[in-house]
Amino acid sequence: MLGGCSSDQSLLADTRQQVVEHVAAPFSQSAITLNITAEPGLNSWNDIASSCTVLVIQAQKASSLNRIMSNPAQLKSLYHGTGAEDNILKVDRYTMMPGKRTTLHIDRSEHTRNVAIVAGYYPFPKKQHMALITIPVTLDSSGWWSKSWSAKLSPIIIDLTLGSHSISHLSHYSTQAPDQTHAAQPVTDGKLTQGEE
């Protein structure tokens, strides 16, 4: 009996994972909300604050975004509005001024599963100026004895604070499950890891 329960649990976990992996990723209007706060000393060079352009890059695969973030020539072309790879679904640019706050409502493109944030600090964005975020998935189950699962991509809210020399805060959460907040911490390989607060 216990063995049967254990294999049922394993099957349920596998089914849930398959549903998440194969979730549909349709276009969704204003499904990405980006709250940006720029500190007064934004993008300081020789103690002089200046503007900073933020890229919001959408792609289906995280690997596509990691390739872009580790390729200075491609990043530069994205800042100039040219040269996006076929795997890049959408690029939005917004220039922040020191001491300002703004909220952007960005459409999520069809097939988007991952979003990269790149802040254009002087002289060029480095690892501490980038973040990779996976679009959250909301799971629903129905049935008592035999559960069936359905999944959909959730709208996401990203809170971003731009400090003097790097991103000083980045967190995100789904509007479907507001109690699930994730913070991003810089690591040495160019990605920001996500962990629950």
Language-model-derived ranges and their functions:
Residues 35-37, 55-57, 118-120:
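Residue-level recognition of well-ordered beta-strand positions that form the cores
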Residues 2-24:
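Bacterial Sec signal peptide processing site at the extreme N-terminus
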Residues 34-45:
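Short amphipathic, basic-aromatic surface patches that mediate peripheral association
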Residues 46-55:
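Short coil-to-beta strand junction motifs in C2/discoidin
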Residues 59-129:
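Mid-length scaffold segments of soluble, non-membrane domains
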Residues 43-47, 105-107:
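Short histidine-centered beta-strand/loop micro-motifs
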Residues 28-32:
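Short structural boundary motif marking the start of a folded domain
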Residues 130-197:
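Glycine-rich, aromatic-bearing surface loops/beta-hairpins
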